[in-house]
């Protein structure tokens, strides 16, 4: 399951060209694309996100008690202005690049703030809405300290880990949300990281 490089046209923005993006076939119609250092000016973007996103601390029911969600979150819905211009540029560039495969634009931008190594997200697929029944895409841009995104086949099997660094782009496509799960595991030591996840309409 090695990454294979393919060449694409450059987007008409200040973002890095899509040339050199690498696709990894996972099986069962699932794949991931990886492009290192796609977003420029990442220190400025990270600082803006920390300061201006209206972060929320959520709680969820687990058995008979409420527990804190181990990260801060916020989702920019359709029509909401994104907190930094490059995020809108990234959304539009992703839409243009993937439209032949996806067939629709990226519409929402979910943000997760992992404050340190204790913050995490458990194994899951984005299967609320159409992701449960249709092939779709979720595009993730990472800002801040490197963290590993782990993936494993749904129902069990060998897992893989992809370290996402400052400005890196990872796109999960095809059947990935239905046939695979992903997670950001806890680690002993890590600095702050923010991920921005672009999704089409009605994929969560």
Predicted regions and their residues:
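Non-heme Fe(II) oxygenase metal-center motifs and adjacent flexible, charged/small-residue loops
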Residues: 1-204
